[in-house]
């Protein structure tokens, strides 16, 4: 096995890591260190923190995120199908129609269950 072919990949990885780490190291070594109470205090958008930063999130945020990922992933399956529609013929067309039908049924089910309501 010839490992000379992997040298550009290794070089690319090393340069990428160096570009990411080198500015942080240089900033830490060469930057001025003048801590004071204002710099060390927690803030939110320039204001003092109103409450604990570790507040609980509503479950609906996670539900909407999962639903977004689910229906966004559908598009990832539709792009290759649309590109190769002429080659796959009627069987490919109808199989994707069944796939989309299942997704529509799932979407209607979520809508009827109230997963998309914010009240």
Curated annotation (Swiss-Prot):
MF annotations from Gene Ontology: NADH dehydrogenase (ubiquinone) activity; NADH:ubiquinone reductase (non-electrogenic) activity; quinone binding
Its EC number(s): 7.1.1.-
Transmembrane segments: 7-27, 63-83, 88-108
Pfam families reported in the protein's UniProt record: Oxidored_q4
Catalyses which reaction(s): a quinone + NADH + 5 H(+)(in) = a quinol + NAD(+) + 4 H(+)(out)
Location relative to the cell: Cell inner membrane
Assigned GO CC terms: NADH dehydrogenase complex; plasma membrane
Chief localisation class: membrane
Class of enzymatic activity (EC top level): translocase
Membrane topology of the entry: Multi-pass membrane protein
Domain of life: Bacteria
HAMAP family assigned to the protein according to its UniProt record, in alphabetical order: NDH1_NuoA
Annotated family: Belongs to the complex I subunit 3 family.
Quaternary organization: NDH-1 is composed of 14 different subunits. Subunits NuoA, H, J, K, L, M, N constitute the membrane sector of the complex.
Function according to Swiss-Prot or TrEMBL: NDH-1 shuttles electrons from NADH, via FMN and iron-sulfur (Fe-S) centers, to quinones in the respiratory chain. The immediate electron acceptor for the enzyme in this species is believed to be ubiquinone. Couples the redox reaction to proton translocation (for every two electrons transferred, four hydrogen ions are translocated across the cytoplasmic membrane), and thus conserves the redox energy in a proton gradient.
Name of the protein: NADH-quinone oxidoreductase subunit A
Gene: nuoA
């Amino acid at each position: 096995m010839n490992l000379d072919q992997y040298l550009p990949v290794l070089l690319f990885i090393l340069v990428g890591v160096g570009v990411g780490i080198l500015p942080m190291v240089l900033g830490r070594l060469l930057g001025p260190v003048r801590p004071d109470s204002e710099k060390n205090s927690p803030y939110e958008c320039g204001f003092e923190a109103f409450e604990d930063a570790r507040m609980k999130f509503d479950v609906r945020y996670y539900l909407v995120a999962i639903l977004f990922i689910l229906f966004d992933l559908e598009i990832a399956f539709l792009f290759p199908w649309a590109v190769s529609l002429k080659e796959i013929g009627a069987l490919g067309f109808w199989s994707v129609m069944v796939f989309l039908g299942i997704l529509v049924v799932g979407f209607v089910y979520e809508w009827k269950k109230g997963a998309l309501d914010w009240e």
